């Protein structure tokens, strides 16, 4: 039997998870795996952040203007010639990553709890 790993509530609280809106999406040609470069707006207080996301089962048109949920306090990560600043969250399925649904009432920058 595999030993389960348990997170603590404090470790969950250490994550800054926010609602954002994808302002721009483009194919990330230099990434090793198929990916998009995303420019995401997290409200006036946080502003814009970049993400490299392996969510290629969506078109650019489906991504731009879409609300997403992202962890915004991981350290920036260099992906090829691009700095990814946030991790966009989704469900891992047989068809690829399915972005989490966000209510239209949620505004950019709202915290996720």
Regions found by a protein language model. Give the residues of each.
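Phosphate-backbone binding interfaces of nucleic-acid-interacting proteins
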Residues: 1-113
């Amino acid at each position: 039997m595999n030993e389960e790993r348990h997170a603590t509530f404090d470790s969950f609280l250490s994550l800054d998870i926010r609602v954002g809106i994808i302002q721009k999406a483009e194919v990330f040609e230099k990434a090793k795996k198929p990916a998009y470069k995303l420019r995401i707006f997290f409200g006036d207080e946080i502003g814009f952040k970049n993400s490299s996301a392996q969510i290629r089962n969506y078109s650019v048109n489906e991504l731009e203007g879409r609300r997403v949920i992202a962890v915004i306090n991981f350290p920036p990560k260099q992906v090829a010639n691009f700095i990814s600043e946030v991790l966009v969250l989704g469900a891992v399925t047989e068809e690829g990553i399915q972005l989490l649904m966000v209510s239209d009432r949620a505004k950019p920058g709202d915290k996720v709890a």
